[in-house]
Regions:
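…; additionally, a secondary subgroup of soluble metalloenzymes is captured
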Residues: 1-411, 418-572, 576-662
Length: 662
C-alpha cells in the first residue's frame, strides 16, 4: 500500500550503494543512525558525559542493551553520566553489579562460573575497555588481576592471592627461601601474563584474597586452599607451604612438628621438651583450619594437657597422707586420667599418632607411681578402721554430707553407680550447660571426694554408702537402710521418711518418669529422695570397647530427673559408690574367682598387688588381695573394671549442684 513504509538497514556507506539505490531512498540519501542519540533517548537524557564517546567499543553493547531492556531508569536531571553507563554495561555483560568494582568485588565475582564465561565471550575491544576500567578501580593489584583475567586465569584469582601471601608476605622473614621466592615469582608472572608483579601488588592481592576466603563456606574455602596448594607445586614453591596459616598441608606440617615434640617429651619429660610442645601447639592453633575438625582438635589439646601434667606431677607427693592423696587425685590427677583417654583414639597423622602412643605409655608409668603411693595409704586407712575427719568414707556420706544439706533444702541424692572422677569432670561440664552449678555447703569442710569400700565393688561400696554403715547388701537392703538412716530421718518431715529408687523403679526406654518417682521429687514435704542410676556400671560390664556415657543425655534417665528436680527447686547431691578403670590392654592373671579386680587372701602377693585387711575390707576375715596397678585383671575382658585399689576405682566424686538461679 502507498502508506506503508519500508526500512532497510545496512552497514555500507553512501558511496558504496550507488546512485540508483540512493535514488530510491527517502530524500535520496542514506540516513545515518547515531548510536549515542538512540542511547540518550532510551535513558530520557538530553546530555551525556563527553568521556563516553571516547570509548567506541561501548556503542554496540549499549545499543543491544537499550534495545533488549523494556525499561531503563531515566538519567537524573536528563544527564547521562559515566556511572550509569558502567552499571548497565557491567551488569548486563558480566553480571557485575557495581559500576566501580573493588578488588574484593572482582574476586567475589571470579568465583561465579557464569561471570567468567561471559568475560570469555566478550570481543577483544570490550575486554580491553572493561579491563582498563577495572584497573582504574581495583587498587594496587588491579593490573595484575586484569592481566590474570585476560590470560584465562579468572577462576584462580583467589587461589593466586593465597600464593602471593606466601611469596610476598610470609617469606619476607625467611631469607633462606629467597631463591625459591625469586624463581617461583617469575613462574607466576609468566603464568598470568604480567611482566613484573611487585611486592605492593602481591601483598594487596594476598590481603583481598584472604578477606574473600574468610567469607566462603568451609567447603568452598577448602576448594580454594587445595587449588592454591596445586599452584604452589606448579610454581615449584612447595617449600613455602609450611609458612601458610591457611593451607591444609601447612596445618599437617605443623601437627607433624607437634607430634615430634610429643614424642621427644614422651622419651624424656623435661621442661624444655614441654616448651617445644606448647610452641608447636600455639603454631597449630594459629592456623585457620584448626577448628575445622572439633573432635581431632580436642584430642590434640588433650595430648598437650597430658604433656603438661606428666611433667608437673612426675614424682609422687612427699607427704603421702591419704587425705592429701585423695584431694590431689580429685584436683589434679583425675584431669590427667580424663585427658589421656582421648589419646587412645590416636590420629591419622602417623607422627602425631606415635607421639600420642608414647605419651600415653608415659602417663601410665607416671600414674602407676602415684597409684602405688595412694594404695599404700589406703591400706593403712582400711587397717585402722577409724574414721578420719579429713577423709570421707562412703559409709559416712549420708551423715556428713546429705543430712546437713537436707536440713536446709529438699535434696535429690543421685548415685551414679561406677562413675569415676574423670567421668564426673566431663559430666559436670554438661550439667553446667544445663544450668546446674557446683557449689559447696561449706568451702572449708566440704569434701572434694569420698573413699570407696574395699573391694571397690557395688555389693560392698554401694550398700555401705546407702546404708550409712559398713556392710554388704543388695538393692532391697539399701532401700530399707536408707529409709531408716537416723541422720536423714531427723531432717525429714513426719510421715515422709527418706525414699530410695533403684533401676527397677526407673523407666527404660519409655518416655517420662514413673509416677511414684515423679511424685516423690515434686512433693515439697519429701525432704530426701535418693535415686541410683546404673547406666555407667552397666556399660562397664559389656565386652565391647564402647564409650562410657559421660553426658546427661547418655546417662538415662538423668535428664528427666534433673528437669523434675529443677521444677521442684531441689538441691542436687551427686556421687558414686566406686569408680573404674578402662580396658587398655590389661594383663589377665588367671583366677578361679569371678571378681575382675580382687581375689581372696591366699597365695603370694605380687609386686603390683597389696594385701588389705581391716574393718573397711568387706570380705571374709576382712582380708583381700587387690591390685594397686591398673595393668592387671583377674577375669574375662570387659569395657572396664573395678574392685582394685587405684584412685580411679577408690575415689568417688562428691558434688553439691544448685540451679543457676538459686
Amino acid at each position: 500500500a502507498e502508506t506503508e513504509k519500508l526500512v532497510l538497514l545496512t552497514n555500507q556507506k553512501e558511496q558504496e550503494l550507488g546512485s540508483d539505490v540512493l535514488y530510491r531512498l527517502a530524500l535520496s540519501r542514506l540516513h545515518e543512525v547515531r548510536p549515542w542519540q538512540v542511547i540518550l533517548e532510551r535513558f530520557q537524557a538530553r546530555r551525556w558525559d563527553s568521556r563516553l564517546t571516547k570509548e567506541p567499543w561501548m556503542e554496540a553493547p549499549l545499543l543491544r542493551i537499550v534495545a533488549e531492556k523494556q525499561s531503563l531508569t531515566p538519567a537524573p536531571g536528563g544527564f547521562l553520566d559515566e556511572e550509569t553507563i558502567w552499571r548497565e554495561l557491567l551488569t548486563e555483560l558480566l553480571r557485575l553489579s557495581e559500576p566501580r568494582p573493588s578488588a574484593k568485588t572482582l574476586l567475589r565475582w571470579s568465583l561465579s562460573r557464569e561471570g567468567l564465561v561471559a568475560w570469555a565471550q566478550l570481543p577483544n575491544d570490550a575486554k580491553m575497555g572493561i579491563g582498563a576500567h577495572l584497573v582504574e578501580h581495583t587498587g594496587p593489584c588491579g593490573p595484575a588481576l586484569v592481566s590474570a583475567l585476560s590470560a584465562g586465569r579468572g577462576e584462580d584469582l583467589v587461589s593466586i592471592g593465597l600464593v602471593c601471601d606466601l611469596l610476598f608476605s610470609q617469606a619476607a622473614t625467611h631469607p633462606e627461601l629467597s631463591s625459591v621466592v625469586l624463581k617461583s615469582t617469575g613462574r607466576l608472572e609468566s603464568w598470568i601474563g604480567i611482566g613484573t608483579l611487585g611486592t605492593e601488588e602481591g601483598r594487596a592481592w594476598a590481603t583481598v584474597s584472604q578477606e574473600v576466603l574468610g567469607e566462603l563456606p568451609p567447603d568452598r574455602a577448602t576448594q580454594q586452599l587445595r587449588r592454591a596448594e596445586q599452584l604452589l607445586s606448579s610454581f615449584h614453591a612447595d617449600a613455602l607451604s609450611s609458612l601458610s596459616d591457611a593451607l591444609p598441608s601447612s596445618l599437617e606440617q605443623r601437627l607433624t612438628r607437634l607430634g615430634e615434640a610429643l614424642g621427644h617429651l614422651a622419651r624424656a619429660p623435661k621442661r624444655t621438651h614441654l616448651d617445644a610442645v606448647l610452641a608447636a601447639l600455639a603454631s597449630s592453633r594459629a592456623h585457620r583450619l584448626w577448628n575445622h575438625e572439633p573432635g581431632r582438635c580436642e584430642r590434640l589439646l588433650s595430648a598437650c594437657r597430658v604433656a603438661q601434667a606428666v611433667v608437673s606431677v612426675e614424682s609422687p607427693l612427699e607427704t603421702p597422707r591419704l587425705a592429701e592423696l585423695v584431694n590431689h587425685y580429685a584436683d589434679t590427677l583425675a584431669w590427667l586420667d580424663r585427658a589421656r583417654e582421648d589419646l587412645v583414639e590416636g590420629d591419622r597423622n602417623p607422627v602425631v599418632a606415635a607421639g600420642m602412643t608414647g605419651l600415653y605409655s608415659l602417663a601410665v608409668t607416671v600414674r602407676e607411681r602415684h597409684s602405688q603411693q595412694f594404695a599404700t595409704a589406703l591400706c593403712d586407712f582400711c587397717a585402722s578402721g577409724h574414721e578420719q575427719e579429713d577423709v570421707l568414707g562412703v559409709e559416712s556420706l549420708l551423715q556428713r554430707v546429705v543430712a546437713p544439706v537436707a536440713a536446709r533444702s529438699p535434696v535429690l541424692f543421685l548415685v551414679l553407680d561406677g562413675m569415676s572422677v574423670p567421668v564426673f569432670l566431663s559430666l559436670r561440664e554438661d550439667l553446667a550447660r544445663l544450668g546446674w552449678i557446683e557449689a559447696m555447703a561449706n568451702p572449708v569442710t566440704w569434701p572434694r571426694a569420698a573413699v570407696a569400700m574395699i573391694p571397690t565393688e557395688t555389693e560392698a561400696s554401694r550398700a555401705s554408702l546407702l546404708s550409712g554403715r559398713r556392710m554388704r547388701g543388695q538393692a532391697g537392703t539399701e532401700k530399707n537402710r536408707f529409709a531408716e538412716h537416723s541422720g536423714l530421718r531427723q531432717v525429714s518431715q513426719s510421715g515422709k521418711p527418706p525414699i530410695l529408687f533403684h533401676k527397677a523403679d526407673l523407666p527404660g526406654e519409655s518416655v517420662g518418669l514413673h509416677d511414684e518417682v515423679r511424685r516423690a521429687i515434686e512433693d515439697p514435704e519429701q525432704q530426701v529422695v535418693g535415686v541410683v542410676i546404673n547406666a555407667i556400671d552397666d556399660h562397664l560390664s559389656k565386652g565391647d570397647q564402647i564409650a562410657i556415657p559421660q553426658t546427661v543425655d547418655a546417662i538415662r534417665p538423668l535428664g528427666l530427673l534433673l528437669a523434675t528436680a529443677r521444677a521442684a527447686h531441689r538441691a542436687l547431691i551427686l556421687t558414686s559408690d566406686h569408680g573404674h578403670i578402662r580396658e587398655r590392654g590389661l594383663t589377665l592373671r588367671r583366677s578361679q574367682e569371678r571378681p575382675s579386680r580382687s581375689r581372696t587372701a591366699t597365695g603370694p602377693v605380687s609386686p603390683d598387688e597389696l594385701l588389705m585387711e581391716g574393718p573397711r575390707v568387706l570380705s571374709p576375715q576382712h582380708k583381700i588381695i587387690v591390685p594397686w596397678s591398673e595393668r592387671v585383671r583377674y577375669a574375662s575382658e570387659k569395657c572396664g573394671y573395678h574392685g582394685g585399689a587405684t584412685p580411679q576405682e577408690a575415689v568417688v566424686p562428691v558434688a553439691l549442684l544448685l540451679q543457676s538461679e538459686q
